[in-house]
Design a protein with these regions (language model features):
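An intracellular "coupling" helix at the cytosolic face of ABC transporter transmembrane type-1 domains
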Residues: 13, 123-124, 140-149, 153, ...
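Transmembrane helices of ABC transporter permease
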Residues: 17-30, 151-205, 278-289
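Short intracellular "coupling" helices and adjacent cytoplasmic loop segments at the cytosolic face
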Residues: 47-51, 104, 111-136, 140-142, ...
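Hydrophobic alpha-helical transmembrane bundles that constitute the permease/transmembrane domains
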Residues: 26-34, 82-93, 145-148, 152-164, ...
Length: 596
């Protein structure tokens, strides 16, 4: 019941349209249930000459009582069948259109809600979530919900209504025949319910396997350069084939379960019809029922079989939608990041103080990434951070951008505690340039203007010149209107990094962080960019993470991180004068440069 409530909650706001579509559906089913009565009257009254039986249909037919004999009578009855079919067709047309409008509105709301919620989830969630899995939940799972709202729930109500109404009409004809027909129905229904309960776990597995395939495709296409460079295409093919076979085998298992269920259901249906024909013929032979009654009863029995069997299939399909709803709710139940937790939006000048900061990632609480880290930067200064891989360099600047929250200690910007400042505001004041920048599959100009869409083309070109990218862009056939491809695949690593630098400089943030974002450019370009940045810098505070000594040697202060702790701190001249990691790296790089 909880799953059904969850599914129906997606229809909120469109309940009137769904109710109208349901009314159209139920009237349509009433017309379907009346057709065997027309057959009964045709056989007994029009052909057999008996008096019209009691009932609503008989009152309608009585309007044509002067034309119910011979050929004219058959024409009247045939015309009524056609008229009923036309009315049912109009009701079906109305139901489909109304249900379509209601469903598309509901699904648009759900899709937007899901996408918006994903946007608001914290960086810690996205760092461990599988992209392919998220994509499937926004597409395949939402589509499964759409089918449930559009037809499956309404078909369930329609089938239950038709079953109840048909049993009522059968009881009006003959109670004993109705009981024979009804006695098998619970067995059919409960077998459907048991089957649905067992098949639901199989649907869940199939959905997970499909998500695994989607993830494999997404990872392969995203990393196609690596696949080509390391000739890993055969490995990727084999990996996908294994996942595809696993998905296929799971679907075959589901199909085999369905085949067994439908074979059992068919046997019950045949037994039900056979019992009605056998006992009904005996009653007709004894003149306890008419030939028209028997034919109508057989029609009702077949009419009863279909919704009962269909109910099993619908319930099974709703089982899929329950799985999809649970997968969607898993995301919606994730606590979103509160981007604007306070109204604190102080003017940022760039005075930064880290005081005894400790930090661990949520999934590795026992492993400290940063341990009692303290340092300070004055407005307009440049701080450089050096350290081996995994020492906590990127984690440190992620804390400053509030992508993660620190466990203990204090970070203050211009005297304000960082965690009291609006996340949205602090991120607008901190420009973060990553080592592997993400570019959208748009033009170069659109990617540069991403941070400030309304900025002029001339300003965008100016910052491209600062990043020493303008000359290279102008060599492209379409210049700044060149499409960079998905994730910037048409650009080199250095070009992507420089585009990201230009994009961040446009923000005019008082604090700019370079997270090893000059690693893909040559030394001379590195020097040229840093020289241009000095002229452009003004009073901005800069934090530069790099493994290259030449990139950070001009910084006002340099800290060396090892195992999450500051092992050294000082200027370039001070650090090369003392034993430690900084001097060792400096000596190695100097020796390599001398040999070059």
């Amino acid at each position: 019941m909880q799953n059904l409530k969850k599914l129906l909650s997606y229809a909120r706001g469109q309940s009137r349209l769904y109710l109208l579509a349901l009314i159209f559906t139920l009237f349509s089913q009433v017309i379907v249930a009346m057709q065997p009565q027309l057959i009964r009257i045709t056989i007994d009254s029009v052909i057999g000459g008996a008096a019209l039986p009691k009932g609503l249909i008989s009152r309608l037919v009585a309007l044509f009582k002067n034309h119910l004999t011979g050929t004219s009578g058959l024409i009247v009855m045939a015309s009524l069948v056609v008229a009923f079919s036309l009315v049912r067709g109009l009701l079906t047309f109305g139901r489909i259109n109304i249900a379509s409008i209601a469903t598309e509105r509901s699904i648009k709301t759900l899709r937007n809600r899901l996408y918006n919620h994903i946007q608001l989830l914290p960086y810690s969630y996205h760092s461990k979530a599988e992209t392919g899995n998220l994509i499937q939940r926004c597409t395949s799972d939402v589509e499964t919900i759409r089918l449930a709202l559009y037809s499956q729930i309404m078909d369930t109500i329609s089938a239950v209504f038709l079953i109840i109404y048909t049993i009522y009409l059968m009881a009006q004809l003959n109670t004993s025949l109705m009981l024979i027909s009804f006695c098998i129905m619970p067995l059919t229904f409960f077998s459907s319910a048991i089957f649905f309960k067992r098949i639901q776990s199989q649907f869940k597995k199939a959905t997970e396997y499909e998500a695994s395939m989607t993830t494999a495709i997404q990872e392969n296409l995203t990393g196609i350069r690596v696949v080509k460079a390391f000739t890993r295409h055969q490995y990727e093919i084999e990996k996908f084939i294994k996942r595809s076979e696993r998905y296929r085998n799971q679907n075959l298992k589901i199909n085999n379960s369905f085949a067994a269920f439908w074979a059992f259901a068919d046997s019950l249906s045949i037994a039900q019809v056979f019992g009605i024909i056998l006992y009904g013929s005996l009653l007709a032979y004894r003149n306890e029922i008419t030939a028209g009654d028997l034919v109508a009863f057989i029609s009702y029995t077949e009419m009863l079989i279909w919704p009962v069997r269909r109910l099993g299939r619908i319930i099974s399909n709703i089982g899929k939608s329950f799985v999809s709803a649970n997968r969607i709710e898993t995301i919606l139940n994730e606590t979103p990041e509160d981007i604007f937790p306070t109204n604190e939006k102080p003017e940022i000048t760039g005075n930064i103080v880290f005081d005894s900061i400790s930090f661990s990632y949520p999934e590795t609480q026992n492993q400290k990434i940063l341990d009692n880290v303290s340092f300070s930067i004055k407005s307009g200064q440049t701080l450089a951070i050096l350290g081996p891989t995994g020492s906590g360099k990127s984690s440190l600047v992620h804390l400053l951008a509030r992508l993660y929250e620190y466990d203990s200690g204090s970070i203050k910007i211009d005297g304000k505690e960082l965690n009291t400042i609006d996340k949205g505001w602090i991120r607008s004041q901190v420009g973060l340039i990553l080592q592997e920048p993400f570019l959208y599959g748009r033009t170069i100009m659109e990617n540069i203007k991403l941070a400030v869409p309304g900025i002029s083309d001339s300003s965008a070109r100016h910052f491209s010149k600062v990043a020493f990218l303008d000359d290279e862009i102008n060599k492209f056939e379409k210049g700044y209107e060149t499409l960079v491809g998905e994730r910037g695949v048409s650009l080199s690593g250095g070009q992507k990094q420089r585009l990201a630098i230009a994009r961040t400089l446009i923000k005019d943030s008082p604090v700019i962080i370079f997270d090893d974002s000059l690693s893909a450019v040559d030394t001379q370009t590195d020097i040229s960019i840093r020289s241009a940045l000095k002229e452009e810098k003004g009073n901005k505070t800069m934090i530069i993470i790099s493994h290259r000594i030449s990139t950070i040697c001009d910084a006002d202060n340099i800290i060396v991180l090892e195992n999450g702790k500051i092992s050294q701190e000082g200027t370039h001249e001070e650090l090369i004068a003392q034993e430690g990691l900084y001097k060792r790296i400096y000596d190695i790089q100097s020796a390599v440069q001398a040999r070059a």
